[in-house]
């Protein structure tokens, strides 16, 4: 289908099985062919996270989202400073809506990336605040959807297009719904195109 970036959820089954699956994918596709991202949704414990991150880093992954559950700033800051695999904050950003809270969180944890979900992070204006603060600290970012209908997905896609961010964005949830409005966007190879 032309996709160059795949995100896989991990942490739900046995770690060795998940690692074997990732090794299988990587044995068939180099990181130049397929960018692999993983999302642990906070499934790792602070005590075993570093060992798992080291093992995952051997697979030339792009990054891992939220390795430990949100709210453990000290532990997450340690991981972001010591991990051989870049860490992206996701759930960690939820609930921090003032500029000062955003500055404090990013300055304390210093992740390599943050993931902006406008529906969960204060809308488009809140997302722009996260992006501005991240860029001040040289923190990378990308935008994803969070189970919006095609109306929300269309708005997020058009907003996303206003930025000059070469990273693959996560805008693919519209196909999950069986009763959805028509979408003026279409996926061609690895890009989203406005069709109407």
Indicate where each model-derived feature is located.
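Generic secondary-structure signature for well-ordered alpha-helical cores
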Residues: 27-30, 58, 84, 136-139, ...
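Catalytic cores of alpha/beta
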Residues: 46-56, 74, 96-109, 125-131, ...
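Hydrophobic faces of well-ordered beta-strands that scaffold small-molecule active sites
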Residues: 4-8, 34-40, 64-65, 87-90, ...
